[in-house]
């Protein structure tokens, strides 16, 4: 039975795990690392890179390197958070045909789901390489505070990557699964998850294999990226103060600054001070300029203090919704790379009144939890029950633009809820059902998930028709809505697809594109491998020909030289099949050369053995003489 993999598709890094017996195992990628940068790059040569190779070339290709794209997933182009992000990243964020935020590279537009699919493909390949079999099913994690549009877009990304997404699971819940799988005693825990782009806090009750989420809260635009940006802004300001040069519009310099900021942030988690050194960051008429700035941990903490404090309010809200006080939490589990920052650990300790638990790897625990959930769905992991919640209230717009909730936030999912509404005007023959998600009292202030019309209502005075609206949330947190006229029995049902979102046709096209790209990538890899093999054979044959060319006939020597020339010509092109054929031809004609080398080696060995015997016998004589001499000495003594 094929394995179900667990993927933590993070803003900054991604991780993949699989159940190995009773334990979840994190799988190393081709570069030997347990996490993979969530970065995709398109080079000038139209080559696509994923993970570490993409990150390595970011400085020289800022506009073609896409990072932190998860922050755009499921968002509209006119979203204030997208507007903010546009000024902070070197690549182009553009308006998609459906009104969503997309990205553009080399004149081609991509949806965030497509870019995320490329990252998922890399994780899929990592798992397949380890397992030695094709992987088709996965559990993918998302921030707990993701809305329906963001969850749907993540599921779309999985489909584009060629994966059947068995379950979308919340990141803090996945972390709790990995943390509590082997714990039998009942506990109330809080999972504080501060990653690269998002922040979540969830309160859970765990014990005897039951993981029940009591509440969740968070901020989908707060994470390590914001800490990096804050540090980059400081470095730009300091450099301007020193040199009078503003680096704000220099994309190459900004990319170098971003890398340096990320490195400095990591170093300051274990040391009190670091130095940011970037030679030749820019130049003016007086010559090249270098950036060298010392940064203390205290200074960095003061720069990001408001970001750290922004995590406190969601913690308060989560406790309030769970009906608990901070002192009633037995354990606080830290998840996400940013929780290594000492200041964050201090704030968590101060708020919850206890040392946070650091026994899990914050970068890997979410993927491990996803793998465990995969094991549960496959039947490999027994006696585990996961009860998650919907993070935001769901409802519809009613008379006067009011948001009428049908399902309150932190309701356990899956769930179903119906409510009966009526018409607002006499003889109204149709109603528009507008579905929203959020916590504000007016519908317009919340997130519009989608809308549909129920038509064919018989003429009647206002307030008479009975229209039943039903909300159904599945275990992935994805919403289905139906409206039914009780009088006529007419019904309209939709799976909520955000007013933007990807249509089935869009997804189908992107799946085909992804498959075509995978085929092109495979051909490119085959071509590179064929070239490497061919070049290696040319080099070794030329070397052997120089050494043993006089041992073969003139005709054989010419045939080998001609085959080398033909292969060199083929190497100038990109035709992998032709290169393979010419490599094979050279291998065959150079067999005579190999035979001559073998015979020469045998002859040398034979001569060596004969000489060795003579040397050995003369050596024996010497030893005997020595022995006799020593003997004589002994006798004379």
From Swiss-Prot:
The modification Phosphothreonine is found at residue 198. The keyword Nucleotide-binding applies. Pfam families: HSP70. The keyword Nucleotide-binding applies. Residues 601-617 have a biased composition (Low complexity). Coiled coil: none annotated. InterPro entries: ATPase_NBD (IPR043129), Chaperone_DnaK (IPR012725), Heat_shock_70_CS (IPR018181), HSP70_C_sf (IPR029048), HSP70_peptide-bd_sf (IPR029047), Hsp_70_fam (IPR013126). Residues 516-542, 601-637 are annotated as: Disordered. CDD domains: ASKHA_NBD_HSP70_HSPA9. It comes from the Bacteria. Residues 516-529 have a biased composition (Basic and acidic residues). Induction: By stress conditions e.g. heat shock. Keywords: ATP-binding, Chaperone, Nucleotide-binding, Phosphoprotein, Stress response. One of its GO terms (molecular function) is ATP-dependent protein folding chaperone. HAMAP family: DnaK (MF_00332). Belongs to the heat shock protein 70 family. Acts as a chaperone. This is Chaperone protein DnaK. The gene is dnaK.
């Amino acid at each position: 039975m094929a394995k179900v993999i667990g993927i933590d598709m993070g803003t900054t890094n991604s991780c993949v795990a699989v159940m190995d017996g009773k334990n979840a195992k994190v799988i190393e990628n081709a570069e030997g690392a347990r996490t993979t940068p969530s970065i995709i790059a398109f080079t000038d040569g139209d080559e696509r890179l994923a993970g570490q190779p993409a990150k390595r070339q970011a400085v020289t290709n800022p506009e073609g390197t896409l990072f932190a794209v998860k922050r755009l997933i499921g968002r509209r182009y006119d979203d204030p958070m997208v507007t903010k992000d546009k000024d902070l990243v070197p690549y182009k964020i553009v308006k998609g045909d459906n009104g969503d935020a997309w990205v553009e590279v080399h004149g081609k537009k991509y949806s965030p789901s497509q870019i995320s699919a490329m990252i998922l493909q890399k994780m899929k390949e990592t798992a397949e390489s380890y397992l030695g079999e094709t992987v088709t099913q996965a559990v993918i994690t998302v921030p707990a505070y993701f809305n329906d549009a963001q969850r749907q877009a993540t599921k779309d990304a999985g489909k584009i990557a060629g994966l059947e997404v068995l379950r979308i699971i919340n990141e803090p819940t996945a972390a709790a699964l990995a943390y509590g799988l082997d714990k039998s005693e009942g506990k109330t825990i809080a999972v504080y998850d501060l990653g690269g782009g998002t922040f979540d806090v969830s309160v859970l009750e765990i014990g005897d294999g039951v993981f029940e989420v009591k509440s969740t809260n968070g901020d989908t635009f707060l994470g390590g990226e914001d800490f990096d940006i804050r540090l980059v802004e400081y470095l730009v300001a300091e450099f301007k103060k020193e040199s009078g040069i503003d680096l704000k519009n220099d994309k190459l310099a900004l990319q170098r600054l971003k890398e340096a900021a990320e490195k400095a942030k990591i170093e300051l988690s274990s040391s009190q001070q670091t130095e940011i050194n970037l030679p030749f960051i820019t130049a003016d008429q007086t010559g090249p300029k270098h950036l060298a700035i010392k940064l203390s941990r205290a200074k960095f903490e003061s720069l990001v203090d408001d970001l750290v404090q922004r995590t406190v309010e969601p913690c308060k809200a989560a406790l309030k919704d769970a009906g608990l006080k901070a002192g009633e939490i037995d354990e606080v589990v830290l998840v996400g790379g940013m929780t290594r920052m000492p200041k964050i650990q201090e704030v968590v300790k101060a708020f919850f009144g206890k040392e946070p638990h650091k026994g899990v790897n914050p970068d890997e625990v979410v993927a491990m939890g996803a793998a465990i959930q995969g094991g549960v769905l496959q039947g490999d992991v027994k006696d585990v029950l996961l009860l998650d919640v919907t993070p935001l209230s769901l409802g519809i717009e009613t008379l006067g633009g009011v948001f009428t909730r049908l399902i309150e936030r932190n309701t356990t999912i899956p769930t179903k809820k119906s409510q009966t509404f009526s018409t607002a005007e006499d003889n109204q023959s149709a109603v528009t059902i507008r579905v929203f998600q959020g916590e504000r009292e007016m519908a317009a202030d919340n997130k519009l998930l989608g809308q549909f019309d129920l038509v064919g209502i018989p003429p009647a005075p206002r307030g008479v028709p009975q229209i039943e609206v039903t909300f159904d949330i599945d275990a992935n947190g994805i919403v289905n809505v139906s409206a039914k006229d009780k009088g006529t029995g007419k019904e309209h049902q939709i799976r909520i697809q955000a007013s933007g979102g990807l249509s089935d046709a869009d997804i189908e096209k992107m799946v085909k594109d992804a498959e075509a790209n995978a085929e092109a990538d495979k051909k490119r890899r085959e071509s590179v491998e064929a070239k490497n093999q061919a070049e290696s054979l040319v080099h070794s044959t030329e070397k052997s020909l120089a050494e043993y060319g006089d041992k073969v006939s003139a005709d054989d020597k010419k045939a080998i030289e001609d085959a080398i020339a033909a292969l060199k010509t083929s190497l100038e092109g990109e035709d992998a099949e032709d290169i393979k054929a010419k490599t094979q031809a050279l291998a065959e004609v150079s067999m005579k050369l190999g035979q001559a080398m073998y015979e020469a080696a045998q002859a040398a060995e034979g001569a060596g053995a004969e000489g060795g015997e003579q040397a050995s016998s003369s050596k024996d004589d010497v030893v005997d003489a020595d022995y006799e001499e020593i003997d004589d000495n002994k006798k004379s003594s």
